[in-house]
From Swiss-Prot:
InterPro entries: Acyl-CoA_Oxase/DH_mid-dom_sf, AcylCo_DH-like_C, AcylCoA_DH/oxidase_NM_dom_sf, HpaB/PvcC/4-BUDH, HpaB/PvcC/4-BUDH_C, HpaB/PvcC/4-BUDH_N, HpaB_Deino-type. Pfam families: HpaB (PF03241), HpaB_N (PF11794). It comes from the Bacteria. The keyword Oxidoreductase applies. PANTHER family: 4-HYDROXYPHENYLACETATE 3-MONOOXYGENASE-RELATED (PTHR36117:SF3). Its EC number is 1.14.14.9. FAD binds at residues 150-152, 156-159, 193, 452-455. This is Probable 4-hydroxyphenylacetate 3-monooxygenase. Pathway: Aromatic compound metabolism; 4-hydroxyphenylacetate degradation; pyruvate and succinate semialdehyde from 4-hydroxyphenylacetate: step 1/7. It catalyses: 4-hydroxyphenylacetate + FADH2 + O2 = 3,4-dihydroxyphenylacetate + FAD + H2O + H(+). It comes from Bacillus subtilis (strain 168). Gene3D superfamilies: 4-hydroxybutyryl-coa dehydratase, domain 1, Butyryl-CoA Dehydrogenase, subunit A, domain 2, Butyryl-CoA Dehydrogenase, subunit A, domain 3. One of its GO terms (molecular function) is 4-hydroxyphenylacetate 3-monooxygenase activity.
Length: 483
């Protein structure tokens, strides 16, 4: 079958009839028409449409040997550095189309599945592990251009390291039975971004201090599997107006709690279960981090380009480019952007073949980006707020410009080089990016995208090779003092 277009994505999603609860009510009818979801579904469909365009199809898709059906390039298992460059080009195309605002664009989860398949052999001959199921799922996903969400975070009942989930009824999703047909899962998982808006949901074990056997599993099931419900938060879509809410009306992804109510996971969908070692080691020893970090930081690079553009447009609109403190603030963004670009280049240039014959980008530069992004992104949004100042809160709506007060607005909200309506449109973009409920969620999302920033820093420290530097200092200290 191969790649799908935008209409096929929407039609398939509507037919699933996933159980989604919004504001205490179960959604009925086509999910693509619901006010809280139609914006992101339309945007997502445009991504699928993008890969079918004649001018992009060879940069967004590829064919397997002997097969004329085109497959999304996000499923490509890279075997050369040139393959990594191809993947980067594809990721950049999709990220630029959404200005980096869609954290769960299809290529993210496609990359996750690709990384699992590329390292499936790690599970070979391990107890209760089925690497062949991962490979089959990967093949089906690529063949049918399936969309995925994932969930692995447990409910925040008690976050102390010594906490055990000993409640009578499961809170965190657990295996409560093993039957001839498959695993029985009951409980909840937190944070499935775009939960209910995809074909499949990938579920795996969260990193934790103590692992219980009944929580050591990984599987993928259709989002409309009986007993799976997605309970969403309040939508940040405040209107359909691209003037009033230029970003949230397009890119509000929605986040969900996933409830598993005695859900049967067929054996052919189980990747592993009742194996604490696999739950602890597969994510860290596989190519998961290398390939997913590569996708994520490219998207974040594009997003920071967008922030730089918005910041410069504000500067031009209110004519403050001559001030050195403004130049310094914009330079902060430029330095961050160029640093990230250079680190991505280094990760690709230093890529090496792994034990399974796949070209992994060097992880250290990607870890450096993941360590600085939680600091850089909030700072860059703050810079936009500081530049905009009071202009970020004195923002009339689109309707105000179609009312009898239009003359007042034109007079008092004009800018040096543009009219009042255009000025407000620019400032509303900056506000939606940094100060609206959508914008603050974006900041929070990037701050915690890879997990706790402290743990990310700790992981970088423990994995960074420091012996060469230590040897250099020891050699210096023991050098002959006469020389």
């Amino acid at each position: 079958m191969g790649i799908i277009n935008g209409k096929e994505f929407i039609d398939r999603l509507n037919k699933l009839e996933n159980e989604i609860w919004y504001d205490g009510e179960k959604i009925k009818g086509n999910i693509s028409e619901h006010p809280a979801f139609k914006g992101i579904i339309k945007t997502k469909s445009s991504l699928y449409e993008l890969q079918t365009k004649d001018e992009l199809i060879h940069e967004m898709t590829y064919c397997l040997p002997g097969d004329h059906n085109r497959i999304g390039l996000s499923y490509l298992q890279p075997k050369t550095k040139n393959d990594l460059k191809k993947r980067r080009t594809m990721i950049e195309h999709w990220a630029r189309h959404t200005h980096g605002m869609m954290g769960r664009s299809p290529d993210y989860m496609n990359t996750v599945m690709m990384s699992f398949a590329s390292s499936a052999e790690l599970l070979k001959d391990k107890e209760n592990c089925f690497p062949e199921h991962i490979l089959d799922m990967y093949e089906q996903a690529a063949k049918h251009d399936l969309s995925f969400t994932h969930t692995f975070i447990t409910p925040q009942v008690n976050r102390s390291q010594s906490y055990f989930g000993l409640s009578e009824k499961p809170i965190s999703a657990k295996v409560i039975d093993r039957t001839e047909k498959g695993l029985m899962i009951h409980g909840a998982r937190l944070l499935a971004t775009q939960g209910g808006l995809t074909d499949e949901i990938l579920v795996f074990s969260a990193p934790k201090f103590f692992f219980e056997t009944d929580e050591a599993y990984a599987f993928s099931i259709p989002s409309n599997t009986k007993g799976v419900k997605f309970i969403t938060r309040e939508s940040f879509v405040l209107s359909d107006s691209s003037f009033n809410h230029p970003l949230s009306s397009r890119y509000e992804e929605m986040d969900s709690i996933v409830v598993f109510d005695h859900v049967l996971v067929p054996w052919n969908r189980v990747f592993f279960y009742d194996n604490v070692e696999a739950a602890k080691d597969f994510m860290t020893k596989s190519s998961f981090h290398a390939f997913t970090f590569h996708q994520v930081v490219i998207r974040q690079m594009i997003k920071i380009e967008f922030l730089l553009g918005v910041a410069q447009l504000l500067v031009d609109t209110i004519n403050v480019s001559e001030y050195q403190h403004i130049q310094e603030k914009l330079s902060e963004i430029i330095v961050g952007l160029e640093t990230i670009k250079a680190l991505i280049d280094k990760s690709e240039n230093d890529a090496q073949l792994d034990e399974f014959g796949y070209m992994r980008p060097c992880l250290i530069p990607l870890q450096v980006i993941s360590t600085i992004i939680p600091k850089l992104y909030p700072r860059f949004t703050e810079i936009i707020q500081l530049i905009g100042a009071s202009g970020m809160v004195t923002l009339p709506t689109e309707n105000a410009f179609d009312s009898e007060i239009r003359e007042d607005l034109d007079q008092y909200l004009q800018a040096t080089n543009t009219n009042a309506e255009e000025r407000v449109k620019i400032f509303r973009l900056a506000w939606d990016l940094t100060m609206s409920s959508f914008g603050t969620r974006q900041t929070h999302y990037e701050r915690y995208f890879f997990g706790d920033p402290i743990r990310i820093s700790s992981r970088l420290y423990t994995s960074y090779p420091k012996q060469e530097q230590l040897n250099m200092i020891k050699t210096f200290l023991h050098a002959d003092t006469e020389h």
